[in-house]
Amino acid sequence: MFPPARGKELLSFEDVAMYFTREEWGHLNWGQKDLYRDVMLENYRNMVLLGFQFPKPEMICQLENWDEQWILDLPRTGNRKASGSACPGSEARHKMKKLTPKQKFSEDLESYKISVVMQESAEKLSEKLHKCKEFVDSCRLTFPTSGDEYSRGFLQNLNLIQDQNAQTRWKQGRYDEDGKPFNQRSLLLGHERILTRAKSYECSECGKVIRRKAWFDQHQRIHFLENPFECKVCGQAFRQRSALTVHKQCHLQNKPYRCHDCGKCFRQLAYLVEHKRIHTKEKPYKCSKCEKTFSQNSTLIRHQVIHSGEKRHKCLECGKAFGRHSTLLCHQQIHSKPNTHKCSECGQSFGRNVDLIQHQRIHTKEEFFQCGECGKTFSFKRNLFRHQVIHTGSQPYQCVICGKSFKWHTSFIKHQGTHKGQIST
């Protein structure tokens, strides 16, 4: 048996209509107004096609003529049912008739057919409204169900404003896709362009679609390799304005030579040439003692201190000297920090945990560093370096006074003691 149906005469257009105040109407853009007009007219046409009999509402007459003044003159939502206004010349509403059992069955059958037609109509409406969630939050049909309850059987009221807070936020700026209100006019205008299907630009090279023309023009420079932004000082051209702005800082800081790889600027061309070797991996500076190569001359000079044995960096606390400043800084932590790291084997304390770990290798006999020539292992890396001199035969430690060379640093230090008291002529 088909579900009971509600009589067509009991359902009027006012049940599916929606009205606005003057203030609410002013907050809608043209795209939203057109959408509202299409939905109301389609609701009315569907009800007529489905056999609902009632006079043509004045609202539909005004919408067909697209006269905006109707929204300001028609009665408010709260008392619109009492008005019952209709277009001039329309017939009065049909009175209810008492149906016979046969007529009741016919009405039930027709109602079931109507529900199928309404479902198809609702799916078409849903396709039009799915992009405007904030404008139409609930737009679907309620179909007849079994039981004594009569379903409304048609498109429910457009829920433009769900609650009072939502209405306030709508007037201030409406919502984004996540349901959050826009708090900036620029974001709102960008959102409205989407709602009104603003014109988009498609790249003919890669097919990418870009909404704004400025972004589209900037994107096309990637394909055509255009550099329209030129520096007036040196003539160098750039693809983007932001890159030109960064480049201008080189001239303002009196650093006209800029590295194209990292953007760093230099005062002299020689500095730029030396810097570029970092990117090209070029190492033209070679140590004459160990043949190790370097990309910068300053790095070579720091390296040569190892061979000369010179220790210019001296600790003011204990007088110990070091060849590198970084080594001195590590040493000074011994004086500035308490020796909180204590060896459990011998009780010796250290200021750094890394020193304690190295010290513990003496007790554990662990040997992590292996010689590639003979396979011998060592607990400390410095011991491995001293051992490798045996295989290479190099004598990296040279006396600057007599020119004699030594394999071991300890031998070099002992030799320098023989020159004490000598005065250079």
UniProtKB/Swiss-Prot annotation:
Pfam family, one: zf-C2H2
Chain positions of all zinc fingers (C2H2-type): 201-223, 229-251, 257-279, 285-307, 313-335, 341-363, 369-391, 397-419
Any single Gene Ontology cellular-component annotation: nucleoplasm
Biological processes, Gene Ontology terms: regulation of transcription by RNA polymerase II
Coiled coil segments of this chain: none
Location relative to the cell: Nucleus
KRAB domain sequence ranges: 11-82
Function description: May be involved in transcriptional regulation.
Recorded family membership: Belongs to the krueppel C2H2-type zinc-finger protein family.
Official protein name in the record: Zinc finger protein 789
Upper taxonomic lineage: Eukaryota, Metazoa, Chordata, Craniata, Vertebrata
Gene: ZNF789
